[in-house]
Amino acid sequence: NSPGAIITLLVNKIDYQLSQIAQIIESNDAKILSLYSENLESNNQIKLTIKISDSKLGAVLQTFSRYDYTVQDVFSDDEISNQGKQRYDHLMKYLNV
């Protein structure tokens, strides 16, 4: 039960390159903690469930988007919820001015 974020990707079988996915994650100073792949026969895709260190989740997600990967789900307690809280706090400060 190590801390981290879980990302679920959908990748076409013909486009699947684990080395590129690992490079995207590691180039954003995150580490792959575990990976599970599932073959989806119905739509010729592979579903990847990747647990990464939570250090730079936002940067990893932006890079996946830039490389046209389909991010199906993201599960994290820290960065995304903290970002939402920070935006809420900024809004409250603005409204108090």
Region annotations inferred by a language model:
Residues 1-97:
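A conserved regulatory-domain signal marking ACT and ACT-like small-molecule sensing domains
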